[in-house]
Amino acid sequence: MDDKEPKRWPTLRDRLCSDGFLFPQYPIKPYHLKGIHRAVFYRDLEELKFVLLTRYDINKRDRKERTALHLACATGQPEMVHLLVSRRCELNLCDREDRTPLIKAVQLRQEACATLLLQNGADPNITDVFGRTALHYAVYNEDTSMIEKLLSYGANIEECSEDEYPPLFLAVSQRKVKMVEFLLKKKANINAVDYLGRSALIHAVTLGEKDIVILLLQHNIDVFSRDVYGKLAEDYASEAKNRVIFELIYEYERKKHEELSINSNPVSSQKQPALKATSGKEDSISNIATEIKDGQKSGTVSSQKQPALKGTSDKNDSVSNTATEIKDEQKSGTVSSQKQPALKDTSDKNDSVSNTATEIKDEQKSGTVLPAVEQCLNRSLYRPDAVAQPVTEDEFALESEIISKLYIPKRKIISPRSIEDVLPPVEEAVDRCLYLLDRFAQAVTKDKFALESENISEPYFTNRRTISQQSAEKLDAACGIDKTENGTLFEDQNVDKEGKALPATGQKANVSPEQPPLFTHTVKDSDHISTRFLGSMDSLTSSEESSERPPLSTLTLKEADPSSKAAMRRKDSPPPGKVSSQKQPAEKATSDDKDSVSNIATEIKEGPISGTVSSQKQPAEKATSDEKDSVSNIATEIKEGQQSGTVSPQKQSAWKVIFKKKVSLLNIATRITGGGKSGTVSSQKQPPSKATSDKTDSALNIATEIKDGLQCGTVSSQKQPALKATTDEEDSVSNIATEIKDGEKSGTVSSQKQPALKATTDEEDSVSIIATEIKDGEKSGTVSSRKKPALKATSDEKDSFSNITREKKDGEISRTVTSEKPAGLKATSDEEDSVLNIARGKEDGEKTRRVSSRKKPALKATSDEKDSFSNITREKKDGETSRTVSSQKPPALKATSDEEDSVLNIAREKKDGEKSRTVSSEKPSGLKATSDEKDSVLNIARGKKHGEKTRRVSSHKQPALKATSDKENSVPNMATETKDEQISGTVSSQKQPALKATSDKKDSVSNIPTEIKDGQQSGTVSSQKQLAWKATSVKKDSVSNIATEIKDGQIRGTVSSQRQPALKATGDEKDSVSNIAREIKDGEKSGTVSPQKQSAQKVIFKKKVSLLNIATRITGGWKSGTEYPENLPTLKATIENKNSVLNTATKMKDVQTSTPEQDLEMASEGEQKRLEEYENNQPQVKNQIHSRDDLDDIIQSSQTVSEDGDSLCCNCKNVILLIDQHEMKCKDCVHLLKIKKTFCLCKRLTELKDNHCEQLRVKIRKLKNKASVLQKRLSEKEEIKSQLKHETLELEKELCSLRFAIQQEKKKRRNVEELHQKVREKLRITEEQYRIEADVTKPIKPALKSAEVELKTGGNNSNQVSETDEKEDLLHENRLMQDEIARLRLEKDTIKNQNLEKKYLKDFEIVKRKHEDLQKALKRNEETLAETIACYSGQLAALTDENTTLRSKLEKQRESGQRLETEMQSYRCRLNAALCDHDQSHSSKRDQELAFQGTVDKCCHLQENLNSHVLILSLQLSKAESKFRVLETELHYTGEALKEKALVFEHVQSELKQKQSQMKDIEKMYKSGYNTMEKCIEKQERFCQLKKQNMLLQQQLDDARNKADNQEKAILNIQARCDARVENLQAECRKHRLLLEEDNKMLVNELNHSKEKKCQYEKEKAEREVAVRQLQQKQDDVLNKRSATKALLDASSRHCIYLENGMQDSRKKLDQMRSQFQEIQDQLTATIRCTKEMEGDAQKLEVENVMMRKIIKKQDEQIERFEKILQHSSLMLQVFES
C-alpha cells in the first residue's frame, strides 16, 4: 500500500453525517477484503488474472459492499479497470454510500479510470446518498476536462435530487468563480431554482460574492425571481448591508426599466460628452469607451477626460470598444488627472451605437459627498420608476450626469442646498460617487463595512477641504472632476466622450446620452473576472473641459492628518503627493460601406499609485473608410498604472484614420492599463493617428500606450504619438500603437510620448506591430524618456496594418522619471504589404533614480506588391536601472518594395533594461535596404536585449534603415542593437549603424546588426558604435546574420567603446551574405576601458557567392584594469565565379587579459603601423593575450560556423591561412621546416597518447563488466530478500486471521454466558411464584375439614328433623346442604390439583439441578478452552518474536548489501578519477598546443623577432617533452595500480562465488523450513475446521436452548391460567363459607323453635297424619332432584379427568426436554474430546516450532559466517586501497 492508513478511519455514520465531500477515500483494511479484492488492493495483475480464470464472481462484494471495480477506481489503477471492464463486470453497482465506480473515480480525480468507464457505457447520471452525480464532484474539484468529458458522454448538467443543489448552485455555494463561468458557457440553466425557490443570484448575494453576481448579471439572470419567503436578491443584499451588490442589482434593474420604457431621451448632463453618429446600412458602434477598469488609489484626484470621436460611414460600419481608458488602479497620494479625448462618428444608414462608455469599474471611496448631488443620487437610486416620473431640468441633468454614467457606492440624505453653494464640493461628490468594479474579486469584510457605515454616519463637513467657492455657472465644467480622500485616486472617465475639450473656466454644454446597455464582461485567465461595467451613448456632444486641483498645502488639518477618519478609510493608500495628469485624445472616423470601429480607446487599464497624480489625456482620432472598414484597438495608452509618490501624466494623442472600402479598426486605444506607483507623477500623452484605406482594411491594436504602471516618486510623461494611415482596398491597420505596456516605476517620472504614424496602402497591405515603444518600464530614480516614432505606410491592395506601437510594456520604477517618446514611422506599399512589429519601445523597466531616455525612431517603407513590413523597431525591451538614465532612440527606417516584400523585425532597440545608478543612452541607427524581387528584411534592429547595469550610462543609439524592394524581397533580422546588459558605474554608449542593401530578385537580408548581445558590466562605460553596411545583389542573394556587435557583457570600471565598422557587398546572382559581423561576443571585464573599433569590409560577389559568418567582431571581453584597444581592420575581396570566402574575420571570442597587442588577420602593413603607434601612446598594463581567442571562431564551410579549436589539423590549416594572408615574407624555408617538424612531433605524441588511452579504456570496460556482474548478483540477493519479506507478510496475515478467530470465539462465549444468566433469573422467578402459591393453599385445608364436619352434623340433624313433624323445613335445608356438599367436592378437586402441581414443582427442581450440573460442566470446558487459547497465544507470541528476529537479520543483510553497493560506488568514483586524470592530460596537451599556436601567431606578427621566437618554441617543446615523459611514467604507474585492482577484484569474485554457494545452501535449508511451515499451516487449517465444528455445535446448543425457552414460556402460560382458576375458586369458597355460617345460625334457631313446639306436634299427631302422607310424596320429589345433582357431579369429575390428561401431556414434554438435555450433554462430551485432540495437535505444533527454531539458528549461524566473510572482504579492500 502506498497510502498510509490514518489513525482512525471515519465510520459510516461519520461519512453520512458529513457534507459528502469529506473523507473521499475508502477506509481499506485487510480483513475487509476477499480474494479478488486483495489482488486489486495490492496491485497484483497476475493474481487478478488467475482469480478471474477460476470463474470467480467478478461482481462479488467485500465486507463493506465494495466491488473490485470500486477499489480499482479508488486506488487509481487504469490497467485493473481495463481488465475488469473487458471481463464484462457491471459498471453501475453501488457501495454503501450508493456511489458507482465512476463517481468514485471522479471524486478522487482519477481521470484515466473515469474515461475508461465512460467509454464502456457507465451511466454518469446516477446519484449517491447525498443526491449528487459525478458532475457535482467534478465541479467541486474544479476539473474542467472531466466536466467536458462527462457532458460529452451524456451527463445531465441539471441532474440532482430534490434536496440537493444542481452543479451551478454548488459552484456558487463553494465560491468557485471559474466553475460558474464554465458552467454558464456550457449552457447551464441560469434561472434554475432550489427547493426553497432561491436562484443562483440569491445564493451569491447571501455569500457576498461580487464576482459571481457580475457574471450572473452579464448572462441576464432573472433579477425579479422570488423565493418561498417572497424575497428578491435585492432584499437579501439590503439585509446583509452589502451596498456594492445592492447597487449592482439596482443598476441592472434600472437599465432594464430604461430599455423597456425609453429608447432615446435628450439629456443635458454636467460632464458634457458629445457623440454624433450617422449610419447608412447596418452600422454598429459598440464598446466605444471602457474608461476605467480598476480603481484609482490616491489621496486627492482631479481627472478631466475629454475624448472626441468623429466618424462617417456609409455601409455596414461598426465602431466598438472605442476607449477603455483606465484598466487598473492609479495608486498615489494626490492625483489630478485630466482626460480630454474627442470622438466623432458620422454614418448614414442603420448605425447602431452600443457600449459607448463604461466609465467606472471599481469603487471610489472618499471623505465627502456633495449634498445636492447625493440627494439626487439617493432619489434616483431608491426610486425604480424614476424615469417615468416628471423631473425638473436641473435635477434631471444632475441625475443623468451622475447616475447614468457613474455608479455610487455611498449615499447620504442631506438637506438640499442652492446651486451656488453646491459648486465647491461637486468634485468631491463625484469622486465619492465613482464606482470602480475592479474590487469585485474581493469579498466585503465586516471591518470594511463597519468603516463605511461609520463614514456614512459622520456629518458632511468633517472631511471637507478648503476650496474657494465658485459660481453656479462653473458647475457644468466641474462635474468631470474627480477627487478622493487621502490614499485613493479617481479619474472621471466618460467626461466629454466626443470631441471638444472644455475650457478651464468651465462652460455649459448639452449632452444627449444614449440608452445604456446591460452588463458586458470579459473574463481573463489570470483573474477569472476582469470586471468591467460598460455603457453606451448614442449621441454625445460636448466642448473642452479642464479642471484644477488645489495643492496639498491647501488641505485642512483633518485631511492632512493620517490618523483622522478620512485618512483611515483606505488602508492601502500611500502618503499623498502631487500628481498632474492630462489626457486629451481626439479621434475622428469616417466610413462608407460596412465599416466597424471597435475598441477605439482603452485609455487607462490600471491606475497610478502615488501620492499626488494630475493626468491629462487628450487623444484625438479621425478615421474615414469606404467599404467594410473596421477600426479597433487604436490606442491602449496605459495598461498598468503609475506607481509613484507624485505623478503628473500628460497624454496628448491624436489619431486620424480615413478608410474607403472594407476597413476594420479594432482595439484602437487601450490608453492606460497600469498605474504608476510613485510620489509624484506627471504624464502627458498626445498621440495623433491618421489612417485611410479603401477595401477590407483592418487596424488592430493601434496604440497600447501604457501597459504597466509608472512606479516612481515623480513622473511626468508626455505621450504624443501620431498615426496616419490611408489604404484603398482591403487594408487592415491593427495594433498601431501600444504606447506604454509596463509602467514607469521611479521616484519622479516625466514621460512624453509623441509617436506619429501615417500609413497608406493600396491593395491588401498589412502593417502590424509597427512600434512597441516601451515594453518594460524604466526603474530608476529619475527617468526622462522621449519617444517620437513616426510611421507612414501606403499600399494599394490587401494591406494590413497592425501592432504599430507599443510604447511602454513594463513599468518604470524610480523616484524621478522624465520620459519623452516622440516617434515617427512612415510606410508605403502597393500590393499585399505587411508591416509587423515596427516598434516596441520599452520591454523591461528602467530601475534608476534619474533616467532621461529619448527615443526617436523613424521608419519609412514603400512597397508595391505583397510586401510585409514587421517588427520594425523594438526600442526598449528591458528596463534601464540607474540613478540617472538619458536614452534617446531616434531610428529611421525606409523600405520600398514592388512585389511581395516583407520587412520583419526592423528594430529592437533595447531588450533588457539598463540597471545602473546613472544611465544616459542614445541610440541613433540608420539602415537602408533596397531589393527588387523576394527580398526580406527581418529583425533589423534589436536595440538592447539585456539591461545595462551601471552607475552612469549614457547610451546613444541612432539606427537608420532604408529598404527598397521591387519583387518579393525580404530583409530579416537587420539589426539587433543590444542583446545583453551593460553593468557598470557610468556607461555612455553611442551606436550608429547604417545598413543599405539593394537586390533585384529573391534577396534576403537578415540579422544585419546585433550591436550589443551581452551587457557591459563596469563602473563607467561610454560606448559609441557606428556601423555602416551597404550591400547590393541582383538575383537570389541572401544577407543574414550581418552584425552581432556585442554578445557578452563588458565588465569593467569605466568603458568607452566606439565601434564604426563599414561593410559593403554587391553580388549578381544567388549570392548570400550572412553573419557579416559579430562585434562583441563576450563581455569586457575591466576597471576603465574605452574601446574604439572601426572596421570597413567590402565584398563584391557576382555569381553564386555565399558569405557566411564574415565578421564576429569581438568574441571575448577584456579583463583588465585599464584598456584602450583600437581595431581598425578592413576587408576587401572580390570573387567572381562560385567562390566562397569563409571565416573572414573573427576578432575576439574569449576574454582578453593582456596589454593591447592585437591580432590583425586581414590588415595591411599601414594599418599595423598605425596600431603600433597607437599602442605606444597607450598606457602599459600587465596582461597577456591568448591567441586562441582569434582562432577559435574560424569557419570551415559556407553555411555553418565552427568554433572548434581542439583538433590540430584545423589549427594547421588556420596557421597556413594566416601565413598566406601575411604575404610572402613569412614563407622562409627555415621557418617552414621548423613549423613542419613541430607539427610532426605533436602528431606522433598525440598518436602515442591515443594508444595509451585506448588501452586504458579497454581495461575500464572490463572493470565495468565485472561491476555489472556483481550488481546482478546483488540484485539476485535482493530478490531473495524480497521473497523472504513476502513470506513474512503472509505469516503476519495468517496470525492476524487467527487472532480474529480467537476474538470471535471470545465474543460467542460471552454471549453464551449472558444467556445462562438470563435462564437462571427466569427459574428463580418461577420458584418464588410456586412458593407464594403454597403459602396460600396451606390455610385453606383446615377450613375444608371443618366444612366436612359441619356437613356430617347437618346430615344427622336432618334425619332427626325428618322424624319430627317439621320435615318440610328439613327438606329445604337438605337441599341447601347438598349444594354445599357439591361445592366442597369441587374444593377437594382443586386441592388435588394443587398436590399434583407440587409434584411437578419437584420435578422442575430436579431438572434445574441437572441444568446447573450441565452449566458447571460447560464452565469447566470453557476454562480448559481458555487454557488452550493461552497456550496457543504464547506460542503465537513466540512465533512473532522469532519473526522479529528474522526481520532484524534481514535488515542486517540489507545493510551488508548496501555496504557492498557503497564499495562499488567508491570503485566507480576511483575509475572516474582515473578518467579525470586522463582528461587532465588531454587538457595539458591542449594547453601546450595553444602555447604553440601563440608562438606561431607571434611569428606572423613580429617578422623581425622570428629567431628569438623559434628558440622560445624549442624551449617550450623540450618542456612539453619532459611533461610528456612524466605523464607516461604516471600512466605506467596507473596501469600497474589497475592490475593490482584487477587482482583484488578476482579475489573478491572468488569470495562472492563462495558466498553464492553458501546462499544456495541457505536456500535449501529455507525450502525445508518452508515445507515444515506448510505442514504447520495445514494443521492450523484443520484446527480452524474443528473450530468451525465447535461453532456449529454451539449454534445447535443455542437452538435447543431457544426451544427450551419456548416450552418454558408455554408452561408458564399454563401455570398462569391455573393460578387464575385457583383464585376464582378461592373467592367462590369464601362466599360459600359465609353462606354456610349464616345457614347454620338459622338452623340452630330453628332447632330451638322446634323443641319448643314438640309438645304441640305430639298433641296434634292425629290431626296431621294426612300431612305426613303429603310429605312422603314431597320426599319422592327430593330424591329425583338428588339424581340430577349426581349427574352434575359426574360432569365435574369428567372435567377433572381432562385436566389430568393435560398434566400428563406436560409430563411427556418434560421427558422430551430431558432427552434433549442428554443429547446436549453428549455433544459437550464430544467437544471435550475434540479439545483433547486439539491439545495433542498443539503439542505437535510445539515440537515443529522447536524444529523451526533449530533451523533458524542454523540460518543465523550461516548469516554470521557471511558477515564475517564480508568483513574479511572489506578488510581486503581496505588493504588494497591503502
From Swiss-Prot:
PROSITE patterns: ANK_REP_REGION, ANK_REPEAT. Keywords: ANK repeat, Coiled coil, Phosphoprotein, Repeat. Residues 942-955 have a biased composition (Basic residues). InterPro entries: Ankyrin_repeat_domain, Ankyrin_rpt, Ankyrin_rpt-contain_sf, CC144C-like_CC_dom. One of its GO terms (molecular function) is ion channel inhibitor activity. Residues 585-596, 619-630, 794-813, 840-849, 862-881, 907-917 have a biased composition (Basic and acidic residues). ANK repeats lie at residues 64-93, 97-126, 130-159, 163-192, 196-225. Signal peptide: none annotated. Residues 260-365, 501-526, 538-653, 671-1027, 1051-1072 are annotated as: Disordered. The modification Phosphoserine is found at residues 829, 897. Residues 1157-1187, 1247-1333, 1362-1480, 1544-1768 form a coiled coil. Gene3D superfamilies: Ankyrin repeat-containing domain. Residues 539-555 have a biased composition (Low complexity). Residues 261-272, 297-306, 631-653, 679-691, 983-992, 1005-1026 have a biased composition (Polar residues). PANTHER family: ANKYRIN REPEAT DOMAIN 36-RELATED (PTHR24147), ANKYRIN REPEAT DOMAIN-CONTAINING PROTEIN 36C (PTHR24147:SF71). Belongs to the ANKRD36 family. This is Ankyrin repeat domain-containing protein 36C. It comes from Homo sapiens (Human). The lineage of its organism: Eukaryota, Metazoa, Chordata, Craniata, Vertebrata.
